[in-house]
Amino acid sequence: MRAEDPYRRIAAVYDRLIEPMQAEVRSVALDVVPPHPGWQVLDVGCGTGTGMARYVEAGCTVTGVDVSESMLERARARLGDRAALHLTDGDTLPFDGGRFDLVTTSMVLHEVAADARMALVAEMVRVARPDSRLLFIDFRFGSLRGWKGPMLRALSEVVERFSGHYSGYRSFKTSDGVPGVVGKAGLGIEREKIVAGGNVAIYVVAPKP
């Protein structure tokens, strides 16, 4: 039996409260890995579909997965039949291996437990084509920049403490974030783009070491 929808209460207001803080990062991500028309793109933890919409507009064939039916309902309302949506955990992706040209996940790794985090990355690697790329967007725990960095770091700490998944955030932080996770998976980071005053980074990773 699937657990209670963890985002049932926030789904209705997510795009108004949370998405504005992520919009700039999503735009930068498109510059970091420009999508090609015809690409098969998978968004793991697709939420309300705002990230997928950008790839649809670029002419990609887009698939999204999420653990929240409430969030997927919002994604369906936004995208209709322009994206294939699946209710599933990231550590059990229902796709054949080597299918996708780009596999992306945004602000997901810090929310899950360490074992689920590694399983999710392994599944992303499995479903990616050998010549594809993995794109990770998540918190960064290095030095901060300007006034925005410290402000967002403090805000993030408060939000995560009351979000219901602080243990995941804490273990993600002590594991050195995305660099630690992909390093443990035997992968290497090809490019890091620091955004949000150093509080978030976009990482490009090859699916094969």
Placement of each model-derived feature along the sequence:
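Class I SAM-dependent methyltransferase SAM/SAH-binding core
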Residues: 42, 48-92
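Conserved class I S-adenosyl-L-methionine
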Residues: 1-36, 50, 152
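A conserved beta-strand element that flanks and buttresses the S-adenosyl-L-methionine
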Residues: 104
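Core SAM-dependent methyltransferase catalytic element
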Residues: 185-187, 191-209
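A short glycine-rich, Lys/Arg-flanked "PGG" loop and its adjoining helix->strand segment in the class I
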Residues: 118-130
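C-terminal alpha-helical "lid/dimerization" subdomain adjacent to the S-adenosyl-L-methionine
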Residues: 137-185, 191-193
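Short catalytic micro-motifs in class I SAM-dependent methyltransferases
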Residues: 107-108
